[in-house]
Every structure is written in structure tokens, then in C-alpha cells.
């Protein structure tokens, strides 16, 4: 069985198909950023993206995934930190930090779907992610901050570069 995990084709044929994705990621592939919280898909610590949508990896078995694309916290940003990860640091969200990988994956998925989310959209998207330390105010602030950063950046292709570049723009749409 082949999956794409963090943009890398990955052969999982040696793993029992009834193994939860969470344990395949952690125990077999060494991707330990995704955390075990409750094991019943209620806390959100194990959140990863399945074909771009946030899901609980503790309840998905590898045998049910077909040729899916999985993104974990380790693969969220191609180079460096994702805007949500930077905002998490800048807003000092983490207290114990155990929930943050799942929280960040859920928040980044929200911003993919709703670049400028309302408080209600944030509440709905983040409802399945529990923070035992209660840093919900800082989580919301980080999501709003990341939203602002992502919306103030424009992607353009420079023929002299091999990849897309990101340049900030001001409120008038002028690249700085």
C-alpha cells in the first residue's frame, strides 16, 4: 500500500492494515509530531490532513486509506515554519504544548478554507481540539494573526527562481 506522506511516496505494505494511522506515523515512520491523546477521536491531538482535510489519525486504519495524501505537522510547511506555527510562537500559545500539533493542523486547515475566518468559524473548526491548559484566547489570537499574515502576502512566479516567492503587500496592494 502506497500513501503520500508529507509529499513523499511512502510504502506501508509492511504494516498491518488494521494499524491506526497515528501509530503507523509514530512507530513505523518516526513522525512523532502527531500526538496520542485519547484514542477515540475526541481530543484532536492526533489531527493530520487527509487529502487536505483535518482528520483524527487515531481512528483511521492504514488499510482504509487507499492512495491518500497525508500531511502531518512535520510536513505542514515546505520550508521553515507555516504562518500558523509562527503565530503560535509569537502569541505564546503553548503552555504544556501537547495539543499544539493538532491545534495547528486544524487551524491551518481552517485558514485554507476561510482565509479571514469569523469568530464563529474559528469556534466550529477548533471545537474538536481540546487544550487542557485552556489557552483558547491565545489560540484564537494566533489564528487571527496567521490569517492577517497569509492575506497580506502575494505569491508570484519569478522566472529566475525555481519556486514561488512570497512578498508582503501593504493595504493598497503594493509589494514592499
Model-derived segments and their meaning:
Residues 1-176:
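Signature of N-terminal electron-transfer/Fe-S-associated modules in redox systems
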Amino acid at each position: 500500500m502506497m500513501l503520500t506522506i508529507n509529499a513523499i511516496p511512502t510504502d506501508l505494505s509492511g504494516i498491518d492494515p488494521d494499524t491506526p494511522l497515528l501509530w503507523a506515523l509514530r512507530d513505523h515512520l518516526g513522525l512523532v509530531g502527531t500526538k496520542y491523546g485519547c484514542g477515540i477521536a475526541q481530543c484532536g491531538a492526533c489531527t493530520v490532513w487527509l487529502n487536505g482535510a483535518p482528520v483524527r489519525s487515531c481512528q483511521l486504519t492504514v488499510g482504509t486509506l487507499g492512495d491518500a495524501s497525508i500531511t502531518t505537522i512535520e510536513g505542514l510547511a515546505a520550508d521553515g515554519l507555516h504562518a500558523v506555527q509562527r503565530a503560535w510562537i509569537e502569541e505564546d500559545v503553548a503552555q504544556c504544548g501537547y495539543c499544539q500539533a493538532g491545534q495547528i493542523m486544524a487551524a491551518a486547515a481552517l485558514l485554507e478554507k476561510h482565509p479571514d475566518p469569523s469568530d464563529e468559524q474559528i469556534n466550529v473548526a477548533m471545537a474538536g481540539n481540546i487544550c487542557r491548559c485552556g489557552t483558547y484566547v491565545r489560540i484564537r489570537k494566533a489564528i487571527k494573526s496567521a490569517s492577517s499574515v497569509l492575506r497580506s502576502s502575494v505569491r508570484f512566479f519569478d522566472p529566475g527562481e525555481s519556486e514561488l516567492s512570497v512578498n508582503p503587500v501593504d493595504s493598497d496592494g503594493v509589494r514592499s
